[in-house]
């Protein structure tokens, strides 16, 4: 069964609405807790000094990584009922979703574990934490008696956010950059900006809050923000 998560690269208002809705929903004991990012993370994005060399290009703002989605192949068939019965912090409701949902606290992540042996891990804040969490889930499965391996680890999406701390004229931005932009405020309050290089989707809000998604590497998040910042500054509200 194909994994169905909120769109990681929203390209129209309906997808963007679904994307942001996933941010706002409560995660406790629900399949919907596989949010792209959590609401508390987006409400107050952190600002960091760029002197650490992590990006920002001298702007003085560095996007914060909010969520990393990775996939792993455990390379064996799994009995999901057995996993749900014997593993901690695991739930399985096949009528609702064809995967075991498992959580660990360190790194704080959630895994979707499928009978095919495929696994999706969400919630990590760094690439290293994503890989560490994925290995921990694989070890849990191994300890339950399955011949699980750790194959084909791949980061599928990195989400970042930031706040430029000034209001933005979204109508003007949409008009001037119509080739890349979609802005339909009656459907979704943010402007959807589809950057070509790097291939990143940005959700830009009038408040100055920005969500960046679709990256495979963190540098793509930083590069996209460096590229969009002068544009945002051009359409700063007085």
From Swiss-Prot:
It is found in: Nucleus. InterPro entries: TBP (IPR000814), TBP_CS (IPR030491), TBP_dom_sf (IPR012295), TBP_eukaryotic (IPR033710). The keyword Transcription applies. Keywords: DNA-binding, Nucleus, Repeat, Transcription. General transcription factor that functions at the core of the DNA-binding multiprotein factor TFIID. Binding of TFIID to the TATA box is the initial transcriptional step of the pre-initiation complex (PIC), playing a role in the activation of eukaryotic genes transcribed by RNA polymerase II. Belongs to the TFIID complex together with the TBP-associated factors (TAFs). Binds DNA as monomer. This is TATA-box-binding protein. The gene is TBP1.
